[in-house]
Amino acid sequence: GTCAGQDKPCKETCDCCGERGQCVCEGPCICRQGYFWIAAYKLGNCK
């Protein structure tokens, strides 16, 4: 997806339970652990 008024998706790194994740368009942090995405409910438990 793209951000409103922008041509390209925006991503930035963020902290996910001590692991690197990505925030897309100032949305919630999206986390990776190995090859597996951490489910949103699991991420909530890390905060």
Curated annotation (Swiss-Prot):
Output the superkingdom of the source species: Eukaryota
The UniProt entry lists the main location of this chain as secreted
Q: List the disulfide bonds.
A: 3-17, 10-23, 14-46, 16-31, 25-29
Where located? Secreted
The UniProt keyword set, sorted, is:
Disulfide bond, Ion channel impairing toxin, Knottin, Neurotoxin, Secreted, Toxin, Voltage-gated sodium channel impairing toxin
Found, by tissue, as follows: Expressed by the venom gland.
Can you tell me which residues the record assigns to a coiled coil?
A: none
What InterPro entries has UniProt attached to this entry? CNTX
Q: GO CC annotations?
A: extracellular region
Q: Does the keyword Secreted apply?
A: yes
One GO MF term on file is: sodium channel regulator activity
Q: Does the keyword Metal-binding apply?
A: no
| Family indicated by similarity | Belongs to the neurotoxin 03 (Tx2) family. 06 subfamily.
- Please explain the role this protein plays, according to its UniProt record: Blocks voltage-gated sodium channels (Nav). Causes rapid general spastic paralysis and death when injected in mice at dose levels of less than 2 ug per mouse.
Q: What is written about domains in the entry's comments?
A: The presence of a 'disulfide through disulfide knot' structurally defines this protein as a knottin.
What is this protein identified as?
Delta-ctenitoxin-Pr2d
